[in-house]
Amino acid sequence: MNILSFDTSSEKFSLAIYRKNQIIYYYSRILKKKYSKYLIPIIKDSLIKVNMKIKQINVISISVGPGSFTGIRLGIAAAKGLSMPYNISLLGFSN
């Protein structure tokens, strides 16, 4: 199972990609209020680095709080936008 997981609930953005229950890629960066500019490009670049396409992801997990209301909304919107065309399951987690 391939999982894309990310957290947009604080100034520090975190992303992990799991393959067969092992983390194969991890990325973390202070983004503050720049999520709308960098979120999708970071996800795209991360998938390229592990030689995967979004359609190979089985589950997208996203932080649902507590944290920044706007950050959480952006993360959920991105996760939903990425998941819908490929019928990828969504999973929310608390941080």
Regions found by a protein language model. Name each.
Residues 10, 94-95:
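Short beta->alpha linker loops
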Residues 59-90:
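DPxDG-like acidic metal-binding loop motif
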Residues 50-55, 84-94:
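Phosphate-handling active-site elements
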Residues 1-64:
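N-terminal beta-alpha supersecondary unit
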Residues 35, 74-75, 94:
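Catalytic-loop motifs flanking and including active-site residues across diverse enzymes
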